[in-house]
Amino acid sequence: MKASVYDFTLKELSQLLKPSFRAKQLYLWLYAKYKTSFKDMQNNFSKDFIAYLEREFTLRTIEIAHVRKSIDGSKKYLFKSLRDNHTFEAVLLKMKDKKIDEETNAILEGEKYTVCVSCQIGCQVGCTFCFTQKGGFVRNLKASEIIQQALLIKEDNNLPIEKALNIVFMGMGEPLNNLDEVCKAIEIFNTGMQISPKRITISTSGVADKIPILAGKNLGVQLAISLHAVDDKTRSSLMPLNKKYNIECVLNEVRKWPLEQRKRVMFEYLLIKDLNDSLDCAKKLLKLLNGIKSKVNLILFNPHEGSKFERPSLESARMFADFLNSKGLLCTIRESKALDIEAACGQLREKKLSQQI
């Protein structure tokens, strides 16, 4: 089976293609001009070279299978692999609307978008609050499949080539359990799509022994830790992984994470009604994170069919956040997006699979 050309870093292509400057030309066709056929690259490639590319490589290996649009402008994408027909998800989040001068119609500030990408089909971690775990683990995604999620979403929304995106590895799968492909994708996002590592966030459930491996790669990305509880008993009930990597183990590795000036490690905390949303939990969280340059991102549980958990009130979330902020721990409440379109991780995929049975 031919490899996808999207699986290769610029350095790898420079070693494969002769002369080596062909690699940069090919990258421009792929990531600056969105060409999806080698024949469309004839302007500066000879027929013989195009024949070589067609013989050695393939291009697109995934396609959009389904899209759902939210009333808030967000979109949930279901992608299908063209090789094995397995499906996985990504989400386009519209973070800010365009600002226009009412008198001149000049664009003062463009829209801001975040793409939430998947790195695995299914997940091995098995978090009880997450819809993805229902389908079990299928396989890791290749770097090319991660990259194509962002490319296809940009194309589908007619976003300008130069439009910068934020990339968050918060879709299906645990990034640190597919670290090689995730790191390769990050390099290609940077050199190919011109997305700065500062715009990329890796969210992990806390695979503690791989955090220093990621740190050692010096990628310059942001780190987010899915914490979700302030004691091991509660966290283990939500995240079985905690039985192997408990809170103390994870935080010990986080303390060693290299931080640029003015940067913080993000801690994601899923608020679940009557489980971890009390003021007492907020006090314990403050104590846990003492000495760590951090930011807490509160997420209100996104209800889905079959879950025993409930969404807390916005009032309780504000009390939680206000307490932490009053004590000097930066805390925000994540704005809920796409609640009307099965945006919970794995929800759209599971729905489509159920319809096929």
Curated annotation (Swiss-Prot):
Matches recorded under SUPFAM superfamilies: Radical SAM enzymes (SSF102114)
Q: Which cofactor(s) does the record list? A: [4Fe-4S] cluster
The entry's active site is 89 (proton acceptor), 345 (s-methylcysteine intermediate)
Which EC numbers does the record give?
Answer: 2.1.1.192
What would you give as a GO molecular function for this chain, any one? rRNA (adenine(2503)-C2-)-methyltransferase activity
Cellular component, GO annotation: cytoplasm
EC class (word): transferase
Name the Pfam families on file: Radical_SAM, RlmN_N
Q: Which CDD domains match?
A: Radical_SAM
Q: Which residues bind S-adenosyl-L-methionine?
A: 173-174, 203, 226-228, 302
Q: Which family does it belong to?
A: Belongs to the radical SAM superfamily. RlmN family.
The name under which this protein is listed is Dual-specificity RNA methyltransferase RlmN
Q: Name the source organism.
A: Helicobacter pylori (strain G27)
What are the top taxonomic ranks of the organism? Bacteria, Pseudomonadati, Campylobacterota, Epsilonproteobacteria, Campylobacterales
Q: Which gene encodes it?
A: rlmN
